[in-house]
Amino acid sequence: VNALLYHWGRESIPELKEGQVSKILSNRRPGIVHRLDKETSGIIITAKNHDTEEFLSAQFRNHSSIVKEYIAICIGRPQHQHGIIQTNIIRDPKERKRFKAVVGTEEGKPAESYYECISCYGEYSLMKVRINTGRTHQIRVHMKYLNCPILGDGIYAHQDKKFPKATLMLNARLLKIKIPGKEELSIFKSPTPERFIEVMKVLKRDYTK
């Protein structure tokens, strides 16, 4: 983020006095048009100037033309090979750090996720998820709702006996978005993280699909 401050230039950032950088960053976060949960890896796009920031941000706000795809290693097998999860998401009244999926109520914010089970190994599943909204913890909450919490999720899943040291197995692997000056969607891809590769090696060794 500090690098983005530099790229935005003096004309867009007020003259700074010592100790003011953190305050401006917390209020403005220049160039940051979307975010990932703390332990989620993968693609994040930023802007170098205000016009580009507005152009990109509008697509995230309106969910227009943009495609966001993730992969996740989950604990459990989904009942169906693929499907759409449509719920509202609210903050869990019993635990303020958690969110939960609810249906049949106007409470909370609507959230929609499309999932596809790529393969299963024992009681683990490799999932592809595309989100049509961008709620906090959306994929993590929806996988929990599906009874397939994400491996390594310290909030929505129990510590796994087979992979007790696993971190959150969620990776933003693909982003399709319009960028200024181009008519067609630009495609950005993230390589598979090493931690995913190591877990998949163990699953393929110990289980058949």
Regions flagged by a language model, labelled:
Residues 29, 40, 66-69, 81, ...:
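A generic structural signal for well-ordered coil/turn residues at beta-strand boundaries
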Residues 75, 129-132:
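A structural micro-motif recognizing beta-strand termini
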Residues 1-84, 88-93, 189-203:
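RNA pseudouridine synthases
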Residues 22-24, 35, 62-64, 103, ...:
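Short secondary-structure boundary/capping segments
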Residues 4, 45, 72, 115, ...:
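Residue-level signal for inorganic ion chemistry
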